[in-house]
């Protein structure tokens, strides 16, 4: 029986070095890795928590505008070799983030909510985000 295909869990620093190309040593390595993922010779999983950290760092540290953050991360998520069972929800969350004043965590919660998966929060943003939620 063949062994299962290896999937790489991609850390925030790899995504940031790839997107920003701001490190002489790690930028080219990140680019090579992401090219391998794009070509299909490697599979990479981009977890929601990594997306959150990428948004935070790009927004707060690099002061990149929301629309650019969303564009960059959406392009990453749409790479052929990127896997994530919640990919469509994360992409939806990025759109919510771009079009609101809510933070990315609230946007992910809203995107993942449904009548059977209700967000509980004191935050009123969820109504504007069209989430299934209950306020206490």
Cite the ranges covered by each PLM segment.
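Short, well-structured N-terminal submotif of metal-dependent ribonuclease cores
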Residues: 1-45, 61-67, 129
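Acidic, PIN/NYN-like endoribonuclease modules and their adjacent C-terminal/linker elements
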Residues: 1-7, 110-136
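Short beta-strand scaffold positions
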Residues: 10, 45-46, 84, 104, ...
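Active-site phosphate/pyrophosphate-handling residues
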Residues: 13-14, 55, 107-108
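Regular secondary-structure segments
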Residues: 34-38, 77, 94-98
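Short, conserved alpha-helical segments within structured domains
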Residues: 46-50, 89
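Active-site-proximal, substrate-binding regions of enzyme catalytic domains
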Residues: 53-79
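Active-site neighborhoods of divalent-metal-dependent phosphate/nucleic-acid chemistry enzymes
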Residues: 81-118
